[in-house]
Structures are given as C-alpha cells and as structure tokens.
C-alpha cells in the first residue's frame, strides 16, 4: 500500500511538472496549485526535492512560460505548506522570486510578482527580515523600462498590456505594510520609501494601479496616520469621485469612509459641506454606487449633535437642486403628449405649467436622492432627540448657557415642517411615506418643546 501511494505521488509529480511549463496559463495555474497541495500532504523530503527541482528548471529552462510556471509553484508551495513547515525554505523562495521579478519578460515578472505577494501574505511576520531588500527591488522595478505598460522590446511591449506589473507591485507594497504593522513608524527610511512609491503609483493614469495605490494608503493610515498629509489625500479622493471609472470611484469612497470613521469632525473641517454635496451628487448620477450612503450616514451620526442646523441646511439644498440631465428630461416632459416622470417631478405635485417653467432654475434632484435626504432628516431628529442635549430642544435653557439659538434643532422646526409637508404631498409614494415620517418626528420635537 505504501509503495502504491509513493508511486502515485511520483506519477502525479511528473505529470504536474510537465504541465507546469505549458504555454496555457490555466494549466500552469492548476499545476502549480496541485504541486502546492501535494507538498502540504507529503513529507519534508518531497518538499525539499520539489524546491530543488524547481530551482534547476528555472536555471536551465529559459522559456518564459516555464519560468512563470515555476514561479507560480513557489508561491503555491509556500502558501499551502505554511510558514512553519516551509520556514527554512523562505530565503530560497524569496531570492528566486525576486530574481524572476526582475526578468524583462512580462509573463515571467508578472507571475513572479504575484507569487511573491502570495508568499509575503503567507509568511506574515516571518518576512520582516526581507522587507528592506523587497522595497529596494520594487524601487528598481519602478525605474526599469521593461516593467512599464509599454516598455521594453516591441514584442514584450505588446505582451505587457495583458500582464501589468505595477498593480501587482502595489499589492506587494500593501502586503509589506501589513507585515510591518505599527513598526512602520520606527524606520523613517522604510516609511519614506513606501510613501514615495505609493504616491508615484497613485499618479499613474491606469485605473488598476490607482485603485491598488489607494488600498496601500488605507493600510498605511491604519498604522501611521500622522505621517500622511490628510488634506492632500482628501483632495485626491474628492477628485476621483467624478471619475468615469467605477472601480476608482468605489476605492475613493471606501477611503473616504475610513477617514470619516476615524475623525468625522476633522473631515468636516477639510471637506466641508461641499464634499458631502459631491457625495449626494454621485447618487444623482448613479444611485447604485455602493458606499456613498454609508459615508454620509456615518458622517451625520458623528457630527449632527454638534450642529444639526448645518445638516438641515445641507438636506434642504439637496432637495431643491438639479442636474443637467434632469433639465433636459424636464424640458422634454413639458412637450405636449409627454407623461410625467417620477425622477424629475417627485416634489412637483400641484405646480402649473407656468410655475414649472418659472422654477426651471431650481429644479429638484432625482427622487432617490431626495428620499435619502429625507431619511437623513429623520436621522437628524432621532439622533438629536436621543443625545440628551437639552439645549437643542429648550431655547430658555440654551440662552441660559449663552448658546446661539441659530444652530440648534429647535430653531429649524419651521423649515422641517415645510420640507416634511412638501414631501408628504409628493408624486412618488416612497417620498410621501418618508415625508410623513419626518413630519411625525417634527411633531415629537414640538411636543417636547411644549412640555419644557
């Protein structure tokens, strides 16, 4: 039985090694995974012989697809075997993959970089001693023409479009940041090198590179936020919000959410109302964009008790603004024979033709955005009422504290009634229902006032 198992291992190993150098990337990937799993099941002798065999193939086989397959196998073996069992082989693995990462052929260095990222994630803290050499290698790679999107020889330039190196380099930087953790604050040289590389990649025109660079920044902010220029970051993320490239837009939203979660008050000083309006504007353009509502809601929850009036002003502006696309749609809707549109006329019930034309300069925003603004008004009333901040509901008490009443919730009751009543008579059912909810909130606030 033992002999049969051994023969099975040898046969499988031989087949996998033959497929490993195949020109088909799917077969190479499957073969490398199979070798990695075999190494995790077999003993130390198999693991050692497999590593030696891969090194020999890399040295003797100059075929780029074969070298790429061997790089994949190194990554698969280390990730499947684990850091403890494969620890003695980490130095050999890293040296081989770093050497292949500098190979000018796009196929070789792309898969070698991928394998290296996989090894770093699997090794975790055990990789600490290789951080400096890895960052130095990444800096050299960034300066090499062969690793650019259209760099190197003509043949390689045509291939590199399918195997972009820079996004994977960013993934490696991200993995290195995770390995360093809070220790990244101790080495100024390492910290500076990481920040400089990430900054350069964030300026690239390619969408994939920028997205990965943003992820690196997010990880860096977790461990050393005091070494990052937050105002410049906010301006950069804000610029990406209007990008036509959805992944870049979503990455910026996630990064802004992280900053808001960390310190919403500071974000209010940096971004101000305009940044929140920009986020609302994204809902106008595409209500399905993930994360926007989460950012705004988190921001509101953390800051509304300090200045509810400012948030009410913001919601008021959102509910009365327009977009260029709506102006075109509403102009078409005013033509004879056209039916009404929920998107453009959510709060336009009861308006005459003349009234609609007179208010064309202040047309309403899309109804889903209006609905979310109403939900924000509901959150404002609820959060302030539950905060225990008596001054927001008691004018005499606020005056006794010497507080200006203009920023308090109680001073905005008339505006809340107006917005809630207008919404409760809207054309769209969802807005009518939310308007009634806000109206109920206002009644509760007014009831508290009468009991003071």
Language-model segments: residues:
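Extended, low-complexity, acidic/polar intrinsically disordered regions
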Residues: 1-452
């Amino acid at each position: 039985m033992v002999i049969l198992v051994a023969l099975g291992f040898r046969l499988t190993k031989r087949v996998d090694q033959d497929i490993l150098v195949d020109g088909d990337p799917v077969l190479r990937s499957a073969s490398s995974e199979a070798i990695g799993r075999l190494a995790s099941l077999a003993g130390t002798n198999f693991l050692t012989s497999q590593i030696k065999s891969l090194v020999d193939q890399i040295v003797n086989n100059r075929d780029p697809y074969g070298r790429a397959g061997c790089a994949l196998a190194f990554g698969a073996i280390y990730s499947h075997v684990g850091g403890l069992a494969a620890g003695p082989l980490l130095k050999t693995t890293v040296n081989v993959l770093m050497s292949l990462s500098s190979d000018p052929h796009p196929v070789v260095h792309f898969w070698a970089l991928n394998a290296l990222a996989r090894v770093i994630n699997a090794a975790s803290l055990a990789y600490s001693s290789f951080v400096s050499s890895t960052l130095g290698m990444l800096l050299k790679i960034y300066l090499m023409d062969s690793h650019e999107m259209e760099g190197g020889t003509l043949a390689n330039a045509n291939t590199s479009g399918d195997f972009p190196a820079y996004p994977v380099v960013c993934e490696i930087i991200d993995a290195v940041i995770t390995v360093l953790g809070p220790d990244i604050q101790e080495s100024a040289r390492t910290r500076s090198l990481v920040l400089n590389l990430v900054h350069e990649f964030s300026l690239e025109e390619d969408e994939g590179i920028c997205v990965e660079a943003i992820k690196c920044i997010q990880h860096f902010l977790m461990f050393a936020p005091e070494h990052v220029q937050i105002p410049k970051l906010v301006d950069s993320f804000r610029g990406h919000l209007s990008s036509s490239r959805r992944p870049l837009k979503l990455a910026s939203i996630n990064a802004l959410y992280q900053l808001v979660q960390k310190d919403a008050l500071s974000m209010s000083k940096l971004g101000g109302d305009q940044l929140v309006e920009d986020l609302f504007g994204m809902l106008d353009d595409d209500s399905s964009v993930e994360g926007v509502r989460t950012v705004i809601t988190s921001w509101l929850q953390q800051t509304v008790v300090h200045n509810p009036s400012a948030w009410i002003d913001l919601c008021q502006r959102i509910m009365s603004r327009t977009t260029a696309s709506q102006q075109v749609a509403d102009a078409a809707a005013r033509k004879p024979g056209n039916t009404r549109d929920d998107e453009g006329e959510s709060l336009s019930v009861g308006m005459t033709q003349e009234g609609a034309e007179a208010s064309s300069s202040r047309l309403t925003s899309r109804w889903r955005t209006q609905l979310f603004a109403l939900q924000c008004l509901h959150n404002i009333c609820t959060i302030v009422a539950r905060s225990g901040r008596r001054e927001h509901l008691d004018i005499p008490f606020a005056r006794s504290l010497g507080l200006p009443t203009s920023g308090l919730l109680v001073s905005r009751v008339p505006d809340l009634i107006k917005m809630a009543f207008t919404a409760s008579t809207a054309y769209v059912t969802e807005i009518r229902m939310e308007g009634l909810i806000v109206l109920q909130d206002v009644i509760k606030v007014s009831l508290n006032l009468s009991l003071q």
